[in-house]
Amino acid sequence: SDVMMRETAGIQCCIDFKSEEDAMRKFKLANKLSPFMTAMFANSPIRGGVDTGYKTFRGLSWLNTDNDRCGFSGKISEEFSFEDYIDCVMKTPMIFIHRDNLNIELNGDITFEEFIKNGFHGESATLGDYELQANLYFPEVRLRNFIEIRNHDCVGGNLKYAILAIYKGIMYDNCAMDECEELFKHLQYKDFSELRYNVPKLALQANIKRAKAVDYAKEIIKIAEKSLRRNQTGDTLFLDEIKEYTEKGLSPADIIQKNWNGSWNKDLRKLIKYLNSKN
């Protein structure tokens, strides 16, 4: 969507893996974590000088972008593999191919799988075409030579380091990964998908089964913090601010909305000053 392309920015985190098994475990867990992380770090309620009523308008814009190439890959199935991910890319409608310094528009008329079989107006598929197709696939978590986690609003100060600290604490510690998998074991794909759709409006107050996102968020932070302490990384200090927000059931967006509709009197200069103070 134009809003997503022109008006939004986010923080991405990249995770290494050592084997297909390791990659798929981290990939599935990152997908399950993603709506909770989006809720925790929601920080984009203002658009065009107006309180949108959403905690993360960036998150909303992604819900209204091409659903063929966005969201979760492969319904987070337990059997998901490298081959399955490639199959998702292959079955995604194509946007364009690049030939002789020109873009040839395909406008979603064919999938990459169909392009390989049938070509397009005399053009045949190349490895470069596949690489472009993979780059134009925008799931919550993208698989490259690393795992690219893509679902966080821009935040400032220690909050941006908190995103990294949480993933470091969980993804590089088998015990922490075990605990997260246990935390999510009663949730199905539809639960994560419904939460993803509810988070832009409600952030941590969104419901998931018989709980709220905030209940899971608190546990996620605890698991990451225990891991960082156990491994003596010295990174737990980066969690202090997000812990404070989460304990109150708040995201950064809640503070912005309160001030915007209160003492800031909807003054963009005060919003900009506040955001600058966070960096």
Predicted regions, residues:
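Mature, function-bearing regions of proteins
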Residues: 1, 5, 166, 243-245
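Loop-rich catalytic cores of soluble enzymes, especially ATP-dependent carboxylate-amine ligases
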Residues: 1-142
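Amphipathic alpha-helical surface "interface" segments used
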Residues: 53-60, 190, 242-253
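An exposure/low-complexity boundary signal
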Residues: 75-97, 211-239
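Intrinsic-disorder-associated interaction segments
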Residues: 78-82, 105, 120-123, 127-130, ...
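Acidic, mature catalytic/reactive cores of soluble proteins
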Residues: 106-118, 135-136, 143, 147, ...
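Substrate-recognition/cap regions that form aromatic- and gly/pro-loop-enriched pockets
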Residues: 146-235
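C-terminal amphipathic alpha-helical interaction region
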Residues: 224-279
